[in-house]
Amino acid sequence: MVTGIDSFKEWFKGYEEQYAIIGGTACDILMTEGGLDFRATKDIDLVLIIEALDVNFGKKFWEYVKQAGYEHCNKSSGVPQFYRFSHPVSNQYPAMIELFTRKLDAIQLPEDTVITPLPIDEDISSLSAILLDDDYYEFLKQGKVTVDGVTVLDAAYLIPFKAKAWMDLTDRKAAGEHVDSKNIKKHKNDVFRLTELIDPATKVVAP
């Protein structure tokens, strides 16, 4: 189980409709629910559901960040907006939270927040491009499920996101961009692992 997920679950109880966890943490939660093992992962990839978001969630989120004492707070420019919070004061909190939002300033920062620019790596760039796609964003909203009090993207919906990221990174590496081969392999392996959770009768129309 991902370190700190219990404090996250308790803190955001009642806000399950306003976010979705994707990526490795979603895989870990789904695989654990299915009684299966998953690779170690330390970060929570959090997508805000803009249509359901209210100001209380933003306040609650920043209270959590402050209580966790994250040493590094970073923010990207442009849309979608991306935040990264890392190095909390204890392992009671997730080692890293990566938050994506399609709307600029969807959550308001307290005046005393110290936040620095965020360098964009290949994984962030790939996911940002996917979330900017209206069809993929609608697809994400359709695939939300609550597992043990935490909202994640269901396996049948997570697989297309992983496959899309794999294709995107593979194409970019072939075009000469610097892309870590480990990231490409990670997404492919996750797809194979997630297929263990799929009911053969399940039908999903991917974008």
Kindly give the residue locations of the regions a language model identified.
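Compositionally biased terminal segments of proteins
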Residues: 1-207
